[in-house]
């Protein structure tokens, strides 16, 4: 019985004897690490060995650029916050006949506070579609990125989410395939009284890290709202603003991102605030119905049309760097509604409200013209008949009545 107990005790001490003097550590110890693009992170792998010097090295990444520094008993992997750092490197350590390994999944992400909402304010009592776009993001995965339209701290009930859209951003440097993702909602009636504002909230969920950005969409109130422009006026209604942007990071690594100043107070006619360089929209009345968007913000700036009443594809567009033209196809009367132009890089937008013009109905014009022509012909026939009756051949009639013609 004593021999059996001694054998069991010896077997229980085997793991302790094997691991004695062999400490394998990785810092940070997580198996998944999220790194913001442009930031750096060092992952240290070390091992102690009583039988000499432990051999430790990283494998699975390109080490030709000096991203790995190997020392006796340790190896340091430097992550530079580039998309090429994404992957799963493995640290391997050996001491005598014993070997250990630890894999780390590295995810490089980009989620700047660059939310753009359209329209920039909401008008109660109108059918509206609101869009929210997150720019320069990575990864552009619906499983990682989610959108929400909030009233207060709750999701807006009755808002119909449309299909999200994803496009690749135009980058100055190659090798950084960032994307923009847009979510649109068809809004229900905002009710009376209308809420002061809605919020677009975008959340990126990563391993042990949750990032959130939020942007305000003000709702115009009757006492401070700009009145809709008179449809008979030719003066357009211009809106430029820098809306509130709010960013909060939650999770195991808690970080608070900077937020922008509060939304400027609405004025009875325009809404504007000092901010970055923005595009400007001009209406060319001499060239017929045509809008010109241009930006004087230095070289490398491009502008494009992003919103128009109806379908933007039905308009004629010409884009040339910092200038973009928009006109109706086929040429016709002014279209009433909001037009939006966007500037890249930067994502700044400018909106222009164009009032409709009252044009005569073409069918009514044709009917009036035909009616006038018929009346003229009838008058001519009557005059010809009277002249023929007065001066026809035969017995000379009494022409006293003809003098009244």
Curated annotation (Swiss-Prot):
Residues 255-275 are annotated as: Disordered. Residues 221-257 are annotated as: Mucin-like. GO terms for cellular component: membrane. InterPro entries: Adhes-Ig-like, Ig-like_dom_sf, Ig-like_fold, MADCAM1. The chain crosses the membrane at residues 365-385. Pfam families: Adhes-Ig_like. Induction: By TNF-alpha, and chronic inflammation. Glycans are attached at residues 230, 253, 361. Residues 22-364 are extracellular. Keywords: Cell adhesion, Disulfide bond, Glycoprotein, Immunoglobulin domain, Membrane, Repeat, Signal, Transmembrane, Transmembrane helix. GO terms for biological process: integrin-mediated signaling pathway; keratinocyte differentiation; leukocyte migration; positive regulation of lymphocyte migration. The keyword ATP-binding does not apply. It is found in: Membrane. It is linked to Absence of Madcam1 in the spleen has been found in aly/aly mice, but normal expression is found in intestinal venules. This aberrant expression is a secondary defect and not the direct cause of aly alymphoplasia, an autosomal recessive mutation which induces total aplasia of lymph nodes and Peyer patches. Homodimer. This is Mucosal addressin cell adhesion molecule 1. It comes from Mus musculus.
């Amino acid at each position: 019985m004593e021999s059996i107990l001694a054998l069991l005790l010896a077997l229980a001490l085997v793991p302790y004897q094997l691991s004695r003097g062999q400490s394998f550590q990785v810092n940070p110890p997580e198996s998944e690490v999220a790194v913001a693009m442009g930031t750096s992170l060092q992952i240290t792998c070390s091992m102690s060995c009583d039988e000499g010097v432990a051999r430790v090295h990283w494998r699975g990444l390109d080490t030709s650029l000096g991203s790995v520094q190997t020392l006796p008993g340790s190896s340091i992997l430097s992550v530079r916050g580039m998309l090429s750092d994404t992957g799963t490197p493995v640290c391997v350590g050996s001491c005598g006949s014993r070997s250990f390994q630890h894999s780390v999944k590295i995810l490089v992400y980009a989620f700047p506070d660059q939310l753009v909402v359209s329209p920039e304010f909401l008008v109660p009592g109108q059918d509206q579609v609101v869009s929210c776009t997150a720019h320069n993001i990575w990864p552009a995965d619906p499983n990682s990125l989610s959108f929400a339209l909030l009233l207060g701290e709750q999701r807006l009930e009755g808002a119909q989410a449309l299909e999200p859209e994803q496009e690749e951003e135009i980058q100055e440097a190659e090798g950084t395939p960032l994307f923009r993702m847009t979510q649109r909602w068809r809004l229900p009636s905002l009710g009376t009284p209308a809420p002061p504002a809605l919020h677009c909230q975008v959340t990126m969920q990563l391993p042990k890290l949750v990032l959130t950005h939020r942007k305000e969409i003000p709702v115009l109130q009757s006492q401070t709202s700009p009145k809709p422009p008179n449809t008979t006026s030719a003066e357009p209604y211009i809106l430029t603003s820098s809306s509130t942007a709010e960013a909060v990071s939650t999770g195991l690594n808690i970080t608070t991102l900077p937020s922008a100043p509060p939304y400027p107070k609405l004025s009875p006619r325009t809404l504007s605030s000092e901010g970055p360089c923005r595009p400007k929209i001009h209406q060319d009345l001499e060239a017929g119905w045509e809008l010109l968007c241009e930006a004087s913000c230095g070289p490398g700036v491009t502008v494009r049309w992003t919103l128009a009443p109806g379908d933007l594809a039905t308009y004629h567009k010409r884009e040339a760097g910092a200038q973009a033209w928009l006109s109706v196809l086929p040429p016709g009367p002014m279209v009433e509604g909001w037009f939006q132009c966007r500037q890249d890089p930067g994502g700044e937008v400018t909106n222009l409200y164009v009032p409709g013009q009252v044009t005569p109905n073409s069918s009514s014009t044709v009917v009036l013209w035909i009616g006038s022509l018929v009346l003229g012909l009838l008058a001519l026939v009557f005059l010809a008949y009277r002249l023929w009756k007065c001066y026809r051949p035969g017995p000379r009639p009494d022409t006293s009545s003809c003098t009244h013609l």
